[in-house]
Structures are given as structure tokens and as C-alpha cells.
């Protein structure tokens, strides 16, 4: 008996003028997600999804490439203006913002939404190399 073929749902192109670019920059990777104003995903990319492996994922260049890929995909769907919210301590924060601007998106605001603990859990110990 042959396996039943399931119909794949086609991605619907949304026409969105303005949205929010969420840049999550960790020590190991950079994720760029572009949403509409309500928070529904329009486009996303990450350094790992572009083929960077290991320590190369955490570089500013990888963050730049991820931001360019997400911006291109969002601009194909009609995105022109974007607010940027940056989260995390990683190396690719500024590089990703510059790449969004260079790709042709107009940045209207930049917010830093890095969560800061009010003395929560104990942080990881310092590395000794």
C-alpha cells in the first residue's frame, strides 16, 4: 500500500506595510524575526538556518546575513517601515540593525527589550580559558 500524499499548505503572501523586527542576539546565535504590528510572523531567519555552524554562528557577519535574508523576504511581502526591538547580549546586535537599514527597510524606532533580572537566579560561572 502506497503512503498517502498529504497536500502541503501553500504559504500565503501577506501584504504588510509596517511591522516589528525582533532581533534576538545570544552568545551562540542571532535570530531575526519580522512580524506585523499584531505580532504575526511575516519572515524570519537565523545564522544557523543560513548554514553557519559552531562558533561562526555568533559572529556579527552571520547576524548581518540573517538580517538581510529576513528583510528581503519581508520586503517581498510589501514591508517598508519597521520598528526594531533588540534582545540579548550577543555580538550581532548592531550588525543586524545596520543590515536591516542597508536592505532598504526604513527603521522608525529602536527598542532594547533585554530582560534584566531583579536579582533572580545565579548566573553561570566565569570561564577560565
Swiss-Prot record:
GO molecular function: rRNA binding; structural constituent of ribosome
PROSITE patterns: RIBOSOMAL_S11
One example of a Gene Ontology biological process annotation: translation
Family indicated by similarity: Belongs to the universal ribosomal protein uS11 family.
UniProt xrefs under PANTHER family: 40S RIBOSOMAL PROTEIN S14/30S RIBOSOMAL PROTEIN S11 (PTHR11759)
Protein role: Located on the platform of the 30S subunit, it bridges several disparate RNA helices of the 16S rRNA. Forms part of the Shine-Dalgarno cleft in the 70S ribosome.
Subunit structure: Part of the 30S ribosomal subunit. Interacts with proteins S7 and S18. Binds to IF-3.
Protein name: Small ribosomal subunit protein uS11
Native organism taxonomy: Bacteria, Bacillati, Bacillota, Bacilli, Lactobacillales
Gene name for this UniProt entry: rpsK
